[in-house]
Amino acid sequence: MAQVKIDWEEFKNNIRYFYNNRKQCEVYIKTVDAAVDTEEKQKRFYEEFGDMCDKISVERVIPIWTGYDEIYKDFDIDKKNGLHGDRIRRVECCPFPFYSFVINPDGQATVCCSDWERKTVVGDANIQSVKEIWNGKQYRNFLMGMLKNGRTQNHEACRVCAYPCYDAVDDIDPYRQKILEKYKNVTREKETL
C-alpha cells in the first residue's frame, strides 16, 4: 500500500525489540482495512503482530483527509458508514476542538489532526504554554465561530473536512446556542479581570 521496500523481518524485529523494552509505553499496532482486505490477510496481520503489542486492530479507512479521493482511488471504500461502522451523519458543529487540539512538530498549535495544511493555527508552543493556547483569544474566537456559524461557515479547513461526519462520538449541535452563551460569559469575565 505504501509502496516502500523494507526488510520485513528486520521491521518486525524492531517492533518486537521496542515492545520488549517499552517500560511504561503502550504499544498499539494498527492497520487499515484497505491494506488487509480479506479475512486471510487480516488473520495473517493478527498472527504476525499480535504477540508484540498491547493492542492491535484493523481500522476502517474513512474519507476525511484533503486529497483522499486521489490517494484511495484504487480502493473500494465504504463512504456510507463511519469509523466505527455507524451511519455517517451531517455534523454542523465539530466537537473535536472543544476537547483537544494538536501541537505540530514545529510547535504550531492547530485545532485538529485533520488540518495537515495548518490553516487553523491558534497558538505556538514555542512561546506559549498549553494552558495559554487553550485559554487564548485565538482559540476562543475559533470555538465561538464554530458555535455561531457551524463548521462549514467557520473556516476553510473545516468546510472541506469530513472527519466529524465519520467519527464524531459527541453531538453538540443541539447545544450550540447554550455553549455559545457560556463562552460569551467566560469571555466577559476574562476581559474584566
Predicted region positions:
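Flexible glycine/acidic-rich beta-alpha junction loops that bind and position SAM and/or redox cofactors
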Residues: 35-37, 57-78, 116
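Short, positively charged
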Residues: 71-85, 137-138
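Short, small/polar residue-rich loop motifs at catalytic or cofactor-binding pockets
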Residues: 95-97
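Short, acidic, Ser/Thr-enriched surface-loop or helix-capping motifs
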Residues: 103-104
